[in-house]
């Protein structure tokens, strides 16, 4: 698909998001929390319901579709095999499955930014009881992390580094590849939370050289909540504990055909050992259809569209005296997430009252773009902020 064709399809996508297409009074900048429903996903849910209503045995069809989705996710991530992909319930479960599969001794340590997402950070912190030391890097003024960020905190007892590819509160794009290439040869695993990046840019887990990554599918991938993905690099799996942290029938390779329990289970040697037998099949269908839509457009077109829209956002806000935190270098910033340095809590209520939906965090108001956003949304946001200024609401 050419660039012009891809951009045209993105622009047409707004018509498939009724919340923004049919409501002139709503301007939505909150994809990083959860995007509004689109007709691709809604139609998939309706299709699932129809199968359940009128098919006497739909589950095998759904299970087969889930396997097709696994293949599609592997293709998107450029995983060497779909066996490296496990479906989970969310990011938290995926991260914890890896964290609790690692070998470590009391006194070993893991290093992460203190601004890491709580779903990631507290997974490591829960292992303190078993003797793991958690080292937190102060990150108040850090808006980009690479290997040099972690190096002063890493020593011979470091077993892992935890990092988000895109930080939820700032939109910064960390240099995951640099971190992995520096520390993985030192037998330090790098676990990456990619929830704020998937569906919004291309990802190559082999090029990034991650030990493992986990993400939820309800943000950039537009699915209902309840489905996540865990990728584990094939060379890393043999280094993990033999028994997964959560075990059900889905983890067992030698499962008896009559479903009898035996005392000598053989766990899958692949990432499938981390799966439940029953997963959110309805959400795997949604993921299949929406990810297919994105891949058909092409992520190079998606990235270009979002970055151009983001540049317009930054330019318009700068005219109003509003700065965006972090680097202006696109190599250090996500495609879609911009945090305006507006700290006064009055703005959150004011924006919502004006129909502008965003999220306020410790560094300011996060304005996160989706494919349904357009230049008119940027203009409406700017006009709303002008109105707030006229109402004498200070930025800070």
Swiss-Prot record:
EC class name: transferase
Keywords, ordered alphabetically: Aminotransferase, Cytoplasm, Nucleus, Pyridoxal phosphate, Transferase
Superkingdom to which the source organism belongs: Eukaryota
Subcellular location field: Cytoplasm; Nucleus
SUPFAM superfamilies to which the protein is assigned, alphabetical: PLP-dependent transferases
Annotated Pfam families: Aminotran_5
Listed InterPro entries: Aminotrans_V_dom, PyrdxlP-dep_Trfase, PyrdxlP-dep_Trfase_major, PyrdxlP-dep_Trfase_small
Principal location class: cytoplasm
A GO cellular component entry from the record: nucleus
Cofactor entry: pyridoxal 5'-phosphate
One Gene Ontology molecular-function label: transaminase activity
The EC number(s) this enzyme carries: 2.6.-.-
Cysteine-cysteine disulfides: none
Residue positions where N6-(pyridoxal phosphate)lysine is found in the record: 219
UniProt similarity note: Belongs to the class-V pyridoxal-phosphate-dependent aminotransferase family.
Listed name of the protein: Uncharacterized aminotransferase C777.03c
Lineage: Eukaryota, Fungi, Dikarya, Ascomycota, Taphrinomycotina
């Amino acid at each position: 698909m050419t660039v012009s064709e891809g951009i045209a399809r993105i622009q047409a996508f707004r018509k498939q998001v009724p919340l923004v297409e049919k409501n002139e009074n709503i301007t939505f900048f909150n994809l990083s929390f959860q995007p509004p429903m689109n007709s691709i996903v809604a139609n998939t849910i309706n299709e699932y319901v129809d199968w359940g209503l009128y098919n006497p045995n739909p589950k095998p069809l759904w299970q087969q579709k889930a396997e097709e989705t696994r293949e599609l996710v592997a293709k998107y991530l450029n995983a060497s095999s779909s066996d490296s992909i496990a479906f989970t319930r969310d990011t938290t479960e995926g991260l914890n499955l890896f964290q609790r599969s690692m070998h470590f001794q009391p006194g070993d340590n893991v290093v992460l930014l203190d601004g890491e997402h709580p779903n990631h950070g507290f997974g490591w912190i829960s292992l303190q009881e078993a003797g793991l030391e958690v080292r937190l890097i102060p990150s108040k003024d850090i808006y980009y992390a690479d290997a040099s960020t972690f190096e002063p905190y890493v020593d011979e007892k470091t077993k892992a580094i935890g990092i988000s590819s895109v930080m939820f509160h700032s939109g910064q794009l960390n240099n995951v590849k640099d971190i992995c290439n520096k520390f993985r040869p030192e037998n330090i695993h790098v676990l990456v939370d990619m929830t704020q990046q998937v569906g919004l840019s291309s990802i190559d887990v082999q090029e990034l050289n991650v030990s493992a990554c986990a993400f939820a599918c309800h943000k950039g991938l537009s699915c209902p909540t309840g489905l996540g993905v865990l990728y584990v690099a094939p060379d890393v799996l043999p280094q993990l504990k033999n028994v997964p942290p959560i075990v059900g029938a889905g983890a067992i390779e030698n499962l008896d055909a009559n479903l009898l329990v035996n005392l000598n289970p053989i766990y899958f040697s692949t990432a499938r050992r981390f799966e439940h037998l029953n997963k959110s099949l309805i959400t795997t269908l949604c993921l299949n259809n929406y990810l297919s839509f994105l891949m058909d457009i092409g992520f190079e077109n998606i990235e270009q569209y979002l970055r151009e829209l983001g540049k317009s956002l930054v330019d318009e806000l700068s005219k109003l005296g509003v700065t965006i935190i972090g680097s202006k270098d696109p190599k250090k910033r996500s495609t879609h997430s911009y945090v305006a340095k507006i700290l006064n809590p009055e703005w959150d209520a004011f924006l919502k009252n004006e129909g502008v939906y965003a999220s306020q965090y410790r560094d300011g108001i996060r304005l996160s773009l989706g494919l349904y956003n357009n230049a008119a949304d940027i203009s409406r946001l700017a006009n709303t902020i002008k109105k707030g200024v006229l109402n004498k609401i200070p930025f800070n």
